[in-house]
Amino acid sequence: RETAQGVTESYEVERDVLLDMLFHEVKENVEVIFNDSISSLEQSAEEVTVTFTSGKRRSFSLLLGCDGTHSVVRKICFGEESSFSLFMQNYFGLSIVDKLLIAEDTGQMFNVPGKTVMLNAYNNKTDIAFCFFSEEEIAYDQRDLNQQMDMIRQHFEREGWRISELLEEMARCNNFYFDKLCQIRMDSWSKGRVALVGDAAYCPSPAAGMGGSMAILGAAALADALRKYPNDFKLAFQEYDRSFRPITEQIQANAIEFGMELVMPRTEEAIQRRNAQFGTVER
């Protein structure tokens, strides 16, 4: 809900906690396969047959790809990621440390033009996020964490504030994640008996702060559509697109128009403009 000052109040649930909650709800009724993924698929009029990386083959009525921004299901069924990825000219590195670097339940942000550091403290943990502007996409090894950390260091090591301390914390953590800031935009979220949900279909980027929420809302929209058309998956997929696409397009547009200026201003003027807006908000 919104407060009198227009600030939206919400509850934030840690990713691991949310996953445990969801798994607890479905574990008695859903077969869950760990440590395996799809390597290929074949569709017929009656079913989808998939081959797993383990070599096993299984057939299903429908295949729903909920496997994130770099979706394997999307690549196999729809084509290369580059056809659907909108690069937002920023890269980010995220680390989570098991201690408080600022007061609990608070956040801090450091900005210079084209560079942002954000701290978010909760439950005796602190998220450390580094983000930097890049006009072009950067070629790097997605498996080489040291190379990715070096890119963060090269962009931030000469900055002041607490940067040296935070870079050391980043180097010591065992959960570092690095990626480009991007959105996934597709003309269609389904092909035959395959449909995509969440970031795989309509990632809004971290600038939106809505990835998890959109995945849950999208799953609910798809479930509603399948319930509405239980005997016709084609109509169900069309209904899913019709009902949920306006929401995804609005959130993605807001991330571009407002989220980037809020979190990653590129000029000193943009930083001052953002700070002035913060100054008018009462907490």
What would you call each of these model-derived segments?
Residues R1-L94, E137-D150, C182:
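Conserved N-terminal helical subregion
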Residues S40, T116-M118, M186:
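Short, surface-exposed charged micro-motifs
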Residues L64-G65, G93, M151, A171-E257, ...:
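Conserved mid-domain beta->alpha element of the FAD-binding
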Residues S71, F92-L94, G114-M118, A201-Y202:
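Histidine-centered metal-chelating micro-motifs
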Residues K99-D105, E137-I138, R162, D187, ...:
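Short helix-loop capping/hinge motifs at secondary-structure junctions, enriched
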Residues T106-I138, M149, R153-R158:
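Active-site substrate-recognition segment that forms the wall
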Residues D141-N175, D241-R242, P246:
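Flavin-binding catalytic cores
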Residues F258-E282:
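C-terminal domain-closing interface element
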